[in-house]
């Protein structure tokens, strides 16, 4: 029976070694699984953080874009209001009563006489008769709302006192105050 005992001892040792190896493998597998799960949690957390950051940036871009769109729309509507206001001034000047227009033209002629005592005067066709007694030779018609253009005898000096050019000068220099009145100070 000596051989049986040796075989049994070898088998017992093999089973014990097998159990040890299995236990070690199971412990190693558990450790690998635990490590993999921890790494997976870190990866998921990092990806979630990246996704949140991307969403936050996207929201910020959308908000900035919306604010810019609102600002553009506001500026466009203000531009439209200013254009309508300008057109209202043009309409008012175009429809001045004849007496008022004659008075304004006389004042403009008087102003022009300071710089050009003699020369030619130009007006729109409707106002030609209002400047016949101006002391200037009538030079013809110009396309304008009203007012006068005076040219020296030699043609070297021109004065543009048309309502159009006066309005544009006043409009340009008064743009900020007009905007402040219409839209409030910014």
From Swiss-Prot:
Keywords: ATP synthesis, Cell membrane, Hydrogen ion transport, Ion transport, Membrane, Transport
One function term, GO molecular function aspect: proton-transporting ATPase activity, rotational mechanism
Keyword Membrane among UniProt keywords: yes
InterPro entries: ATPase_E_C (IPR038495), ATPase_V1_Esu (IPR002842)
GO biological process: proton motive force-driven plasma membrane ATP synthesis
Main location: membrane
SUPFAM superfamilies attached to this UniProt entry: V-type ATPase subunit E-like (SSF160527)
Subcellular location(s) per record: Cell membrane
Pfam family, one: vATP-synt_E
Record's GO cellular component terms: plasma membrane; proton-transporting two-sector ATPase complex, catalytic domain
Keyword match Ion transport: yes
Topology class, membrane: Peripheral membrane protein
Function: Component of the A-type ATP synthase that produces ATP from ADP in the presence of a proton gradient across the membrane.
HAMAP family: ATP_synth_E_arch
Assembly: Has multiple subunits with at least A(3), B(3), C, D, E, F, H, I and proteolipid K(x).
Protein family membership: Belongs to the V-ATPase E subunit family.
Name of the protein in its database record: A-type ATP synthase subunit E
Species annotation: Methanocella arvoryzae (strain DSM 22066 / NBRC 105507 / MRE50)
Lineage of origin: Archaea, Methanobacteriati, Methanobacteriota, Stenosarchaea group, Methanomicrobia
